[in-house]
């Protein structure tokens, strides 16, 4: 059985200032389908701040407010997931990590036992950073770094990032009509990793750079990452279920012909 981590970003899960319920439903349906095809799936989900904002519209530019919104929104987000997974007779669980959990072998070991047990019992772990006490991903990263660490330390074969960025291109496709998709990337240049990040929207804190940093981390540890659109899931379905690489970008240190 192949183990994967799927990370969905804020831009995919939010629409008009609240949770995009149809996109969330499509994501849950994808995970249910993957499980039928013998995948173990853990989900790293953003969206807590957006969910909290629907109940208390605080200024999101203030870090303390974002922490408060995340605290309000996290249980709301989980409830939405629980209702949708129940339609497929699936249980989901909430797993919150503090930023320093991956700095301790003991903490990683304990967390892995919990994740392994959940997956062995057909439960979908829904993972997020505990934004009330850990603010780095809340400020910058949109869980890209967290998802890479989850994939590595919990022995996933692949990290799938579903984003408003549907692939890596040789130049900015928003500015250049002749931009070409890079289907497979074996190495990321240092200047690509050091470029200034570009926030996606009012709820998102990442951009292509944090995704490249996640991919670079995984490739250096012998693991792979697939970047694809979270708005239209045909590319990720083709890649994971049909074994066809029609869209998106695969980051792998293994050269493929």
Curated annotation (Swiss-Prot):
Pfam family, one: AA_kinase
One GO process term, biological-process aspect: L-proline biosynthetic process
Protein name, entry field: Glutamate 5-kinase
Pathway the protein contributes to: Amino-acid biosynthesis; L-proline biosynthesis; L-glutamate 5-semialdehyde from L-glutamate: step 1/2
List of residues binding substrate: 46, 131, 143
Catalyses which reaction(s): L-glutamate + ATP = L-glutamyl 5-phosphate + ADP
Binding site for ATP: 7, 163-164, 205-211
Biological function: Catalyzes the transfer of a phosphate group to glutamate to form L-glutamate 5-phosphate.
GO molecular function: ATP binding; glutamate 5-kinase activity
Keyword vocabulary terms for this entry: Amino-acid biosynthesis, ATP-binding, Cytoplasm, Kinase, Nucleotide-binding, Proline biosynthesis, Transferase
Family per record: Belongs to the glutamate 5-kinase family.
The protein's Enzyme Commission number: 2.7.2.11
InterPro entries in UniProt: AceGlu_kinase-like_sf, Asp/Glu/Uridylate_kinase, G5K_ProB, Glu/AcGlu_kinase, Glu_5kinase, Glu_5kinase/COase_Synthase, Glutamate_5-kinase_CS
A GO-annotated cellular component: cytosol
Lineage: Bacteria, Pseudomonadati, Campylobacterota, Epsilonproteobacteria, Campylobacterales
Cellular compartment(s): Cytoplasm
Source organism: Sulfurovum sp. (strain NBC37-1)
């Amino acid at each position: 059985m192949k183990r994967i981590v799927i990370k969905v970003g804020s831009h995919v899960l939010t629409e008009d200032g609240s949770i995009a319920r149809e996109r969330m439903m499509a994501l849950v349906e994808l995970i249910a389908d993957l499980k039928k095809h013998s995948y173990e799936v853990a989900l790293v989900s953003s969206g807590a701040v957006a969910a909290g904002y629907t109940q208390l519209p605080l200024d999101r530019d203030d870090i303390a407010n974002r922490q408060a919104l995340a605290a309000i929104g996290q249980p709301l987000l989980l409830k939405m997931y629980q209702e949708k997974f129940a339609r497929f007779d699936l249980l989901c669980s909430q797993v919150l990590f503090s930023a320093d959990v991956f700095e301790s072998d003991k903490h990683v070991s304990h967390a892995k036992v919990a994740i392994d047990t959940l997956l062995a019992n057909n439960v979908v772990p829904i993972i997020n950073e505990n934004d009330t006490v850990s603010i780095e991903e809340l400020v910058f990263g949109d869980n890209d770094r967290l998802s890479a660490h989850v994939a590595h330390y919990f022995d996933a074969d692949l990290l799938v990032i579903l984003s408003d960025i549907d692939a890596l291109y040789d130049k900015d496709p928003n500015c250049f009509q002749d931009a070409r998709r890079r289907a497979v990337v074996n190495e990321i240049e240092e200047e690509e990793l050091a470029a200034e990040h570009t926030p996606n929207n009012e709820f998102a804190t990442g951009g292509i750079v944090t995704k490249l940093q996640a991919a670079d981390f995984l490739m250096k540890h012998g693991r792979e990452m697939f970047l694809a659109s979270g708005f239209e899931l045909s590319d990720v379905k083709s890649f994971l279920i049909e074994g066809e690489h029609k869209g998106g970008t695969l980051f792998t240190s293994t050269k493929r012909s």
